[in-house]
Design a protein with these regions (language model features):
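C-terminal helical subdomain
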Residues: 124, 187, 191, 206-234
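Hydrophobic pocket-lining residues within nucleotide cofactor-binding pockets
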Residues: 67, 188, 196-197
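Structural signature of beta-strand start/N-cap positions in the alpha/beta core
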Residues: 36, 87, 144, 188-190
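Short, intrinsically disordered, charge-balanced linker/junction segments flanking boundaries
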Residues: 178, 195, 200-202, 206, ...
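Solvent-exposed, charged/polar functional surfaces in cytosolic regulatory/catalytic domains
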Residues: 79, 83, 132, 176, ...
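Short-chain dehydrogenase/reductase
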Residues: 2-117, 203-213
């Protein structure tokens, strides 16, 4: 059931790749609640994924941009404001990738070049996004910026590897930039984690059932992944 909670609101959603993506589910729910969207991912992801299907389904515009490149982000926010007809009310950051995990490098034998890429894509891109938005004055007063994090940012999940470091950094950026943006413009910068069930980096993990159950019991959004993900839109 929709309640028009986002009626008239303009948003940018980073990271929708296919219908298994958390960002995809958030986009669907946001549009159900009345939002207008720009969807973005890297040029390669836009070509290889099915984001165009989501755009057609939701009546959204796709703007390809590399979230690790400041010039791409500047282009993205400028074009998004033109397409949507004004400043942005909400942004979802759902960007994460670890080549160390894909290559099965253990945490005590990381490739530091790949670690740099992990941190840049999964965390520092969030700072770049916020900094560009602030310099361009692209967000409305009291806008909301949300990044997806993971329980491994503060719990040891063997196998989550350098992504745990990236999520810790992501949360630190949210606190530090949120303090500045909140005081100056009332912009709310937050992270939210879902119950740890099959976000893309997590599918390689072999963890105990108890580790999967704990966040469901203890965390504020103690609900299944699909419901949880869609709720973040609100």
């Amino acid at each position: 059931m929709a309640y028009n909670l986002l009626k008239g609101k303009r948003g940018i959603i980073f990271g929708a790749l296919n219908d298994q993506s958390i960002a995809w589910k958030v986009a669907e729910r946001a549009v159900e609640e009345g939002a207008q969207l720009v969807l973005t991912n890297t040029p390669v992801a836009c070509r290889m994924g099915t984001i165009s299907q989501l755009a057609e389904q939701t009546g959204s515009t796709v703007i390809a941009a590399d979230a690790t490149k400041v010039e791409d982000l500047e282009m993205l926010f400028s074009e998004a404001m033109q397409v949507l007809g004004g400043k942005i009310d909400f942004v979802l950051h759902s960007c994460a990738m670890s080549a160390n995990m894909r290559k099965k490098r253990p945490y005590d034998d990381l490739d530091y070049g790949l670690l740099d890429k992990t941190l840049d894509i999964s965390a520092i891109s969030f700072h770049k996004m916020l900094q560009v938005a602030k310099k361009l004055d692209a967000l409305n007063d009291f806008a909301s910026v949300l990044a997806l994090t993971y329980v491994a940012s503060h719990r040891t999940f063997f196998g989550y590897n350098d992504m745990a470091d990236a999520k810790s950094l992501l949360e630190s950026i949210a606190r530090s930039f949120g303090y500045i943006y909140g005081r100056e413009k009332g912009v709310r910068v937050n992270t939210i984690l879902s119950r740890p069930l099959t976000p893309q980096p997590a599918v390689v993990l072999k963890v105990l059932t108890a580790c999967l159950t704990l966040p469901t019991v203890c965390h504020p959004l103690a609900m299944p992944m699909r419901t949880n993900a869609q709720t973040t839109a609100l």
